[in-house]
């Protein structure tokens, strides 16, 4: 049951008849003829009037607001000028002035210079084509860091590897462990210098030997080759080019493979010759090839299998067991000699197996 405005007669009738009332939340629409949009339009009109009034007041200018603005400007000027420092006491050391260490203006200028000086990787990659004289002049004759007496007094060495006062002064400083100045480039130039020195040495040796009479050109080449080993010049190439170069320089293996020959060489010796190889005719092989097939090294047909020499076991040979029917060995007479059976016929022999016509 919702609580409604009991003063309203409609609410009292609804509560008496239906035991519940529907109350107006804002208690503004007390009659059915009033429109809720009228209230919204009235509120919007009042808000617009207040807005216009505030604009008019801002144009005319409030003397109180002007006074507040002037006070704020005066406070900003006082902060910029700064309060005068108290006179130094005799027992205390005087702090360094802002003019000596640079000040805020100098720090801003250093930041701008820092951002302008910061190099990129592409610049150093493109600088590989510079001349050797400029690199040697920069690396050898340019001081890497200022000496202690050259630094201004009171301005310590700060962090970072940039130029400027109070922040250290080295171009050779590396960024996050990586030297962007082109260290490998300078090393590469040194390698080139070494290679040039080594190349000029054998050239001088060849010039001296050329002056001496009675020396052939082959001996000169041998002397140059016997000298110091020549270092290979570093070249830039892709992986595919390097693989192709390795394939070209790789020696080719030549195998002496003997081709199969149908004829038997004259120096060949027959170790084992088959017994029936001469008796077999080619025609019979072609006719019986699909019926009988035997391996070349099959020796089963050469064995003589004879089962007549095996002794037969007796019933009582294991002793007098059971009812005593076992026979003793003395009772048996002398056994006759084993009969030799005839060798099995040879299937390949036409006499043993004549062809059926």
UniProtKB/Swiss-Prot annotation:
InterPro entries referenced in this protein's UniProt entry, alphabetically: HABP4/SERBP1-like, HABP4_PAIRBP1-bd, IHABP4_N
Pfam families in alphabetical order: HABP4_PAI-RBP1, IHABP4_N
Domain notes: The C-terminal region is necessary for nucleus and cytoplasmic localization. The N-terminal region is necessary for nucleus and nuclear bodies localization.
Assigned protein family: Belongs to the SERBP1-HABP4 family.
Record field: compositional bias (Acidic residues): 348-357
UniProt keyword terms in alphabetical order: Cytoplasm, mRNA processing, mRNA splicing, Nucleus, Translation regulation
Originating species: Gallus gallus (Chicken)
Record region (Disordered): 56-116, 150-186, 313-357
Biased amino acid composition, Basic and acidic residues: 96-115, 176-186
Subcellular location: Nucleus; Cytoplasm; Cytoplasm, Stress granule; Cytoplasm, Sarcoplasm
CC terms in the record's Gene Ontology section: Cajal body; cytoplasm; cytoplasmic stress granule; Gemini of Cajal bodies; nuclear speck; nucleolus; nucleus; sarcoplasm
Subunit record text: Associates with ribosomes; promoting ribosome stabilization. Interacts with EEF2/eEF2; promoting ribosome stabilization.
Protein name in UniProt: Intracellular hyaluronan-binding protein 4
Role summary: Ribosome-binding protein that promotes ribosome hibernation, a process during which ribosomes are stabilized in an inactive state and preserved from proteasomal degradation. Acts via its association with EEF2/eEF2 factor at the A-site of the ribosome, promoting ribosome stabilization in an inactive state compatible with storage. Plays a key role in ribosome hibernation in the mature egg by promoting ribosome stabilization. Ribosomes, which are produced in large quantities during oogenesis, are stored and translationally repressed in the egg and early embryo.
Compositionally biased region (Gly residues): 155-171
Domain of life: Eukaryota
GO MF annotations in UniProt: ribosome binding; RNA binding; translation elongation factor binding
Disulfide bonds: none
Biological process, per Gene Ontology: mRNA processing; positive regulation of RNA splicing; positive regulation of translational initiation; ribosome hibernation; RNA splicing
């Amino acid at each position: 049951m919702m609580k409604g405005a009991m003063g309203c007669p409609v609410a009292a009738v609804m509560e008496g008849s239906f035991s519940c009332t529907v109350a107006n939340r804002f208690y503004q629409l007390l009659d059915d003829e009033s429109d809720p949009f009228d209230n919204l339009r009235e509120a919007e009109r009042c808000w617009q009037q207040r807005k216009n009034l505030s604009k008019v007041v801002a144009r005319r200018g409030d003397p109180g607001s002007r006074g507040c603005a002037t006070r704020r400007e005066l406070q900003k000027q006082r902060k910029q000028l700064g309060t005068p420092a108290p006179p130094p006491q005799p027992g205390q050391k005087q702090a360094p002035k802002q003019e000596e260490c640079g000040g805020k203006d100098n720090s801003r200028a250093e930041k701008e210079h820092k951002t302008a000086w910061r190099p990129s990787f592409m610049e150093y990659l493109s600088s590989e084509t510079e001349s050797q004289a400029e690199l040697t002049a920069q690396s050898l004759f340019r001081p890497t860091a200022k000496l202690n007496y050259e630094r201004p007094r009171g301005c310590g060495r700060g962090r970072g590897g940039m130029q400027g006062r109070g922040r250290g002064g080295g171009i050779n400083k590396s960024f996050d462990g990586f030297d962007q100045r082109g260290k490998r480039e300078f090393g590469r130039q040194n390698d080139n210098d070494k290679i040039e020195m080594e190349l000029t040495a054998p050239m001088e040796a060849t010039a001296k030997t050329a002056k001496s009479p009675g020396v052939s050109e082959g001996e000169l080449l041998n002397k140059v080759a016997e000298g110091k080993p020549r270092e290979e010049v570093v070249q830039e190439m892709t992986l595919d080019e390097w693989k192709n170069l390795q394939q070209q320089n790789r020696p080719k293996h030549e195998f002496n493979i003997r081709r199969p020959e149908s004829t038997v060489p004259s120096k060949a010796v027959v170790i084992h010759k088959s017994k029936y190889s001469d008796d077999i005719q080619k025609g019979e092989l072609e006719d019986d090839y699909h019926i009988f097939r035997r391996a070349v090294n099959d020796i089963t047909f050469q064995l003589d299998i004879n089962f007549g020499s095996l002794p037969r076991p007796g019933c009582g040979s294991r002793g007098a067991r059971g009812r005593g029917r076992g026979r003793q060995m003395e009772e048996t007479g002398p056994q006759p000699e084993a009969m030799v059976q005839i060798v099995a016929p040879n299937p390949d022999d036409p006499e043993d197996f004549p062809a059926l016509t």
